[in-house]
């Protein structure tokens, strides 16, 4: 198993048996049209792989896939789950599982709101505000969990008691994605406009994917072909 920790308690891992095929599968799938295949990776394969990606002939990249195990805050997973094409998701459900002393997310640093871009933060809050923001967040988590526990104790069903839970709680999910979907995720979520918290996970995904599909993931590093 390969595993990369993200933040204090999050992680991304590939379980044993979670990798399906390799770079050679991609180019050999493309060669089916000519009834040809390669047995070993060579320069012709690298050129073909680059041609396929550069010209958006992406169907061969959908024949390979990876299954990831993920532990991340719910708000990160909700962004991540917008990636649906070529993907399959399963996540812990707090309808079936009661939350016991939840693990919660704290930012390393709080950012200020960008005055022009409504969807992103920019810069870092002053130190005094960092401390206060952390205290406010911690208090919010405590209030939410006490409310959840009170609802459970009075007999409210789990599927309704969970309504009060914050999106900063960590959850676990399994994500199986085609190589094309993985590369698309990396390309989008490593962009500087992406939220830092999901960008940290995209770094981990890229690092793990590159172990098993080095030639394909290299296509995302355009400077390597200059």
Predicted regions span which residues?
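Family-specific signature for flavin-dependent thymidylate synthase
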Residues: 1-226
């Amino acid at each position: 198993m390969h595993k990369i920790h993200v933040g204090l308690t999050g992680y991304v891992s590939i379980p044993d048996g979670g990798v399906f095929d390799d770079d050679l599968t991609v180019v050999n799938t493309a060669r089916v049209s000519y009834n040809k295949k390669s047995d070993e990776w060579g320069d012709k394969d690298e050129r073909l792989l680059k041609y396929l990606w550069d010209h958006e002939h992406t169907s061969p990249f959908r024949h390979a896939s990876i299954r990831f195990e993920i532990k991340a805050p719910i708000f990160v997973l909700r962004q991540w789950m917008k990636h649906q094409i070529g993907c399959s998701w399963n996540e812990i459900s707090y309808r079936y599982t009661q939350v016991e002393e939840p693990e919660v997310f704290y930012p390393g640093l709080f950012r200020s709101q960008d005055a022009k871009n409504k969807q992103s933060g920019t810069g870092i809050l002053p130190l005094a505000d960092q401390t206060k923001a952390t205290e406010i967040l911690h208090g919010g988590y405590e209030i939410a969990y006490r409310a959840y526990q009170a609802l459970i104790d009075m007999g409210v069903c789990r599927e309704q008691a969970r309504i009060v839970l914050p999106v900063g709680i960590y959850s676990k999910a399994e994500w199986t994605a085609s190589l094309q979907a993985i590369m698309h995720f990396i390309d989008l979520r490593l962009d500087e406009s992406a939220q830092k918290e999901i960008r940290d996970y995209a770094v981990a995904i890229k690092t793990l994917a590159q172990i098993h599909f080095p030639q394909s993931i290299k296509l995302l590093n355009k400077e390597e072909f200059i």
